[in-house]
Amino acid sequence: MIQLKKGSKKLLNAWAFYDWANSVYTLTIASSIFPLFYSSLFNSKDELVSAFGFQMKQEVLIMLVTAFTFLVVVFLSPILSGIADYVGNKKNFMKFFCYLGSAGCIGLYWFDLNYIHLSLLFYFMGLIGYWGSLVFYNSYLPDIAFEDQQDSISAKGFSMGYIGSVLLLVINLAMVMSQEDEAGAIKMMKYSFITVGIWWALFSQYTFYILPSGVSSGHKVTKYVIFNGFRELKEVWKQLKQNLRLKRYLNAFFVFSMAVQTIMLMAVYFGEKEIDWASDSEKTTGLIVSILVIQLVAIAGAILTSKASSKYGNIKTLIAVNFIWMFLCVYAYFIKTP
């Protein structure tokens, strides 16, 4: 295939299309159906789970595995990105994490408390596959798009991700709600995990077909190359010390991102545990529909925020949005009924 030129429409669309492929993971697995499925495995909200030689609360176990996965990603990202840049095969790394995540999603079909460690391995694979592939996916942007194209194509990727993930969630929602009993609903949830894995791997093929593979350098991977990513981070940190404004921004973003990611990952567990639902069926339907509505509101919110930024500026808009978000988080603390 002819190598597409940097900035070409076809190349940019192929890059953005990966959001369509992988965003189904964050919506179906991380945010909606898997948390409901996981909670349904226990007889009561307070039932403990045994794993790694400890007895702990259900949601604590998932939080610990999630936190560990993020630590692994943080440690591996500089190493793998350094190797990929040196050897010239970032697409292969992106493929590896994509297929790892896809296999993990499909493996969740066999999630069973009797085999909790194997089950958590599948969960770990899905999570690290998603975030690991994003490292290389995002690194492609400056290679394929000119600076004046990057904002628009990133926004297009987010939009495609929203649309694709909502589309599959609607299908999964119909599957779950079509069942008359809890056992049937749980079965459909497990099938939903398979659809996510297949969707992710299948639709990513177009992206992999179009994106450049990179020029192989023929260099061997040495100890120096493996840790070169950390050396680059060290140099970046030295430069940050000289730019006080950028340093403050990154510190603020760290705190902001930590809060947002916590809400995104734990919202359904909170809704399942703290809200007084009339029945399990109402809980399942209510939480999934809530997640779906949130996605639709997010699309409208992104459009309104973009317009507000154009009129009032990014800083003022961001401050206003953060205050609204903080108010809603505090308000959610006092909610007890649907």
Predicted regions span which residues?
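Pair of pore-lining "gating" transmembrane helices in MFS-fold secondary transporters
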Residues: K6-K45, F124, N243-I263
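Helix-to-loop junctions at the C-terminal end of transmembrane segments
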Residues: F75-N89, A300-N314
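Juxtamembrane intracellular "pre-TM" segments in multi-pass secondary transporters
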Residues: I2-N13, P212-N251
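Glycine-rich segments within core transmembrane alpha-helices of 12-TM secondary carriers
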Residues: S154-V176
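Short amphipathic helix-loop junctions that connect adjacent transmembrane helices
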Residues: I29-E59, L265-G286
